[in-house]
């Protein structure tokens, strides 16, 4: 009997997790991708495992089953842990379950700036810092400003996050990111909250000087670090996106005008 128990324990601890690990793969699907105001049909790769499928299907019972079979609650698949899938799907119920099963928030791969406000608020209430700074010097609020996520901006402001914090490498503020990408509503929210528009980045530029800089500039292959569509795209598609984007000569002058008006009204 003891031999059987030892064998079963060995299978649960070593064999099943190994099988699950082998199931980790990159699944490609076609999505609408937005790069600097242009929309593309692009194949996007997502790390896929059985637990990821269960989370996407909102199947809590299947998630429980997979974990009970020995899949690690913090086991990564191409950098993603199960909690990342719950965050990506804005699934508070499963995120809560994973945390109760000892999922570590320190292993979260997704920048808070990519999160929807609901899941971000839940995680912050569970102890995640709203002031996280990432390797490129950017904060969650800066990325939310770049990605045009006013709801998350409002949440972070409500929680006391300082909107005047600067990127530790470039000196840019959240207001500069919002102005650079012509995100009118984010600019409005930040200015109404009393953000300082006169802060200078490390090259001496104020937020007013950043209006439409990224929205209008030409793309380069190195931008793959910042644009998910370029980062995930095959080489030929990457070149196609860059070529098409750089051939566009029109500017969104209405948004530029609206943002300048907002700056003038908050001097």
UniProtKB/Swiss-Prot annotation:
Give the protein name, as stated in the record. Putative ankyrin repeat protein RF_1099
Matches recorded under InterPro entries: Ankyrin-SOCS_box_domain, Ankyrin_rpt, Ankyrin_rpt-contain_sf
Domain of life the protein comes from = Bacteria
Keywords assigned by UniProt, alphabetized: ANK repeat, Coiled coil, Repeat
Q: Where are the ANK repeats?
A: 46-75, 78-107, 136-165, 170-199
Lineage summary:
Bacteria, Pseudomonadati, Pseudomonadota, Alphaproteobacteria, Rickettsiales
Instruction: Give start-end ranges for the coiled-coil region(s).
Output: 238-265
Indicate the secretion signal residues.
Answer: none
Q: Which Gene3D superfamilies match?
A: Ankyrin repeat-containing domain (1.25.40.20)
Q: What biological-process GO terms show up in the record? A: positive regulation of protein catabolic process; protein ubiquitination
Query: Organism source for this protein?
Result: Rickettsia felis (strain ATCC VR-1525 / URRWXCal2)
């Amino acid at each position: 009997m003891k031999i059987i128990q030892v064998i079963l324990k060995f299978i649960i601890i070593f064999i099943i997790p190994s099988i699950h690990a082998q199931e980790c793969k990159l699944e490609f699907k076609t999505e609408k991708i937005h790069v600097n105001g242009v929309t593309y049909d692009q194949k996007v790769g997502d790390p896929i495992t059985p637990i990821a499928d269960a989370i996407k299907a909102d199947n809590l019972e299947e998630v429980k089953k997979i974990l009970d079979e020995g899949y690690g609650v913090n086991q990564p698949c191409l950098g993603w842990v199960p909690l990342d899938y719950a965050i990506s799907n804005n699934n508070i119920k499963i995120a809560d379950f994973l945390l109760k099963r000892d999922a570590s928030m320190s292993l979260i791969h997704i920048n808070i700036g990519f999160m929807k406000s609901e899941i971000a608020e839940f995680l912050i209430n569970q102890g995640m810092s709203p002031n996280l700074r990432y390797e490129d010097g950017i904060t969650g609020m800066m990325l939310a400003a770049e990605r045009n996520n006013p709801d998350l901006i409002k949440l972070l402001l409500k929680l006391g996050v300082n909107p005047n914090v600067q990127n530790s490498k470039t000196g840019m503020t959240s207001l500069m990111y919002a102005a650079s990408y012509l995100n009118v509503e984010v600019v409005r929210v930040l200015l109404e909250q009393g953000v300082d528009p006169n802060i200078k980045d490390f090259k001496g530029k104020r937020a007013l000087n950043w209006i439409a800089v990224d929205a209008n500039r030409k793309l380069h292959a190195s931008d793959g670090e910042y644009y998910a569509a370029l980062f995930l795209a095959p080489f030929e598609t990457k070149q196609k996106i860059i070529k098409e984007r750089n051939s566009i000569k029109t500017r969104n002058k209405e948004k530029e005008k609206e943002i300048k008006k907002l700056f003038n009204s908050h001097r």
